[in-house]
Amino acid sequence: MDILEAIILGIIQGLTEFLPVSSSGHLELAKAILGDTSVPEESLTFTVVLHFATALSTIVIFRKEILQIFKGLFQFKWNDEFQFSLKIIISMLPAVIVGLLFEEELESFFGGKILLVGCMLLLTALLLLLADKAKNTKKEVSFWNAALIGVSQAIAMLPGISRSGATISTSVLLGVDRTRAAKFSFLMVVPLIFGKIGKDLLSGGLSFQSSEIMPITAGFIAAFLAGLVACKWMISLVKKSKLSYFSIYCAIVGSIAIGYALLN
């Protein structure tokens, strides 16, 4: 992998981590169109580095909120900070349970399931459109909301469903304030990303040669900077009810995917 390729992959990771277009769905489409051998899997080390970069960009943007979460966890007082920390934990549980108990079943949905990807992209488009039209979105995230948002995050583990799109749309459709919905969506995934990184580190297989240091570094910086831009941009778009743009995009790509699957 050269430096330019690493930068491109880093930018893609940084953008798709926050924008509601489903990075996993796009990867599956690329594999199918170009052929599995034409789109090689990124090394585990490089993938872990990119995920760490986007998690770090989230921490930088939401550093005040994250500090409040940690304070809330260790205060053991039934205040707003402690309740918010519990809501984050509750929202994580469905994805953790599904990931641990159904890892093999989830993996079976990947690898050439283009018709599924297309259908899930259409579902993402519908969710985004409905969320964009939602009214009376002024609520805080309740414990029940957190659980339902967590379920939507678990469902979004399927290729073609955008994680941020599913969680933000679910929040808004439940009446949660749009800005709060976006912030909660991005904060709830940070522990999961670090959990996944930890699991990959413990499983071994993370290695790189000296010649890969520069590409990995370039990819990290690109993903971090792209993540900063995408995260701020996404919050602004949600607040201004501009999710319909991504709804149209997902609908177009989803339709193309379904057409491709039916013709092949």
What is the predicted role of each segment?
Residues M1-N264:
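Multi-pass membrane proteins that catalyze or facilitate reactions on polyprenyl-/lipid-phosphate substrates
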